[in-house]
Amino acid sequence: MPTYNESENLAAIVAAIYAALPDTALLVIDDGSPDGTGELADGLRARYPTLDVMHRQGKLGLGTAYVEGFRYALRHDYAIVFEMDADFSHDPRYLPALLAAAGDADLVIGSRYVPGGQTPDWGFSRRLISGFGNIFARTILRLPVRDCTAGFKCYRRAVIEAFDLDAIRLEGYAFQIETVYQAYRKGFRIVEVPIVFPDRKIGTSKMSRDIVAEALGYVFRRRLGGGAHGARRAPISHDEVASS
């Protein structure tokens, strides 16, 4: 779970994660937050023995944080790996549902755009930008996924092992699209489960125009440059997951 200036959310989100999955292990990756998020995370370790904290020097970005987290998970031999935000836009109450869906899938996406998914706090312009971005990405890259830019995911270890982590130099939406793209092109089974995605109530959003521009440019470059090789396999539909 990457963090940057999330001191107001951290204690509550950590407590909610452990309430949802008591036997989990949690890694907080803090990019030198000036508000003391990293130090607060260190202090929580006494209460949560399976909580670990990675301190990075400076704001190095979401994509590199997840790559570091993936490497950590591989080193520690974790079979299942989640990624999520620390601001409660990704509600920990959905963690058991994502984990259950991983019984029939390799990558599970907490999706805003399958039936049952919602973005209740978004205005028209944000819905338009996000909706267009997802249609654009899945059309250009031919991805059978409704929510290509989702950042709430559950991976089986084999998916992360198949990623070329050394080659990933992306942030934000582009990073999220790339993980879906690589998983699909390498033949892994992908499912989407619906989530309600509220806006953060505390703290400041990290979204920027640069992140959106990076994602648009990445999609074009990925399409023009080919992609990861591997046999395609049709993903399990969200309807199959909902009925399981």
Model regions: which residues?
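Catalytic donor-sugar/metal-binding loop of nucleotide-sugar-dependent glycosyltransferases
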Residues: 144, 167-171, 180-196
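Short, well-formed alpha-helical segments that are part of the catalytic scaffolds
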Residues: 6-20
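Acceptor/aglycone-binding surface of glycosyltransferases and processive sugar-polymer synthases
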Residues: 54-75, 80, 92-173, 200-215, ...
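Terminal low-complexity segments of carbohydrate-biosynthetic enzymes
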Residues: 40, 103, 158-159, 217-244
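Short helix-capping segments at alpha-helix termini
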Residues: 19-23, 45-51, 77
